[in-house]
């Protein structure tokens, strides 16, 4: 499953992310990962989730970010859900067009490794392409 929550700053994406991660810990049979820029959510998200702060990595583009995801999955085949908070903060040079291609590659990871992805996108929904709109929920 791929799910995208899209909206401008202040539209409630972060509370949905926190609730989603904390709920997934109780529901998922495997490990849950939350990727965010900074440590601001570490007190809101259960310690049972693996938190990854992208500030520790030099993420220049969406391809490097995809490499990070592949590394997470390769290191732990028990990962069943990856939550990504504010992808454009973790990948500041990324565009909505980049996100379209990224979603296509996530579909392959989802199918091959049975990993679900929930992505928070700070943007107006009207700027999303068809591939992104398919997963808005």
Task: Tell what function each PLM region has.
Residues 2-72, 129-130:
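Conserved P-loop
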Residues 1, 30-31, 77-80, 115:
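Short coil/turn segments at beta-strand junctions that form active-site/ligand-binding loops
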Residues 1-4, 17, 100-102, 137:
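Gram-positive cell-envelope targeting signals
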């Amino acid at each position: 499953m791929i799910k995208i929550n899209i909206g401008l700053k202040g539209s409630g994406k972060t509370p949905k992310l926190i609730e989603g991660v904390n709920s997934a810990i109780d529901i998922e049979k495997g490990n849950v990962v939350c990727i965010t820029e900074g440590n601001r959510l570490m007190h809101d998200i259960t310690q049972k989730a693996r938190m990854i702060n992208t500030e520790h990595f030099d993420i220049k583009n969406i391809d490097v970010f995809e490499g990070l995801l592949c590394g997470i999955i390769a290191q732990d085949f028990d990962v069943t859900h990856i939550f990504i908070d504010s992808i454009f903060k973790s990948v500041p040079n990324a565009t909505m067009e980049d996100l379209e291609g990224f979603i296509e590659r996530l579909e392959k990871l989802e199918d091959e490794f049975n990993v679900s992805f929930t992505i928070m996108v700070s943007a107006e929904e009207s700027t999303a392409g068809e591939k992104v709109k398919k997963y808005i929920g």
